[in-house]
Amino acid sequence: MNVAKRHFLTHCSLLGTFLIGCGGLSALPALAQSGDKPPKYTVLVVGDSLSAEYGLARGTGWVALLQARLAEEKKPAQIINASISGDTTSGGRSRLPALLLRYQPSHVILELGGNDALRGLDLRMTEANLAAMTQAALQADAQVTVVGMQVPPNYGTAYARDFSQLFERVAKQHKAALVPFFLKGVADVPDAVRLFQADRIDPNEQDQ
């Protein structure tokens, strides 16, 4: 296994640990016996290419690994991955009401905002969209985890700071769980470029 793959899989495992421990998934009861009827817990993931397995073999992204981790711990939850590569917070906001109605999730993970930054969109709009999505999920009786992102320094110190902080504000204002930086341990390590695909945005899982 190459270094990039190992780093990415390790990161996925750590993210899964965080979501289980801090994202409300630890509260899911394990099955006492194999014959028990599993309760209906549904985890809805609304994200972009980082969650949609863009450029990766099916079943190797962090969402699939989280599903495997929950199964390993005998936590009977179904994960619905409604992520779309290239999606923005505006796109997610427009899609979320129908997703909530269709799946009636017990938990919602919001991994959006990166493409807003790549397109230079107004961060006030990004924050408003994430806040609206969080509020909608809470009103649907779901526990919410907001997944934060960061942008490189070349975006400007002020923009990078404001972008990072908007996720914190949304989570704090709505009392949602927060993953401060989705790519911590991947994008912030020396020579991080080797851990990414050619677009230098999405982590690389392929052997070199």
Can you describe what each PLM-predicted range is?
Residues 55, 80-89, 118-121, 200:
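Acidic/histidine-rich helix-loop elements
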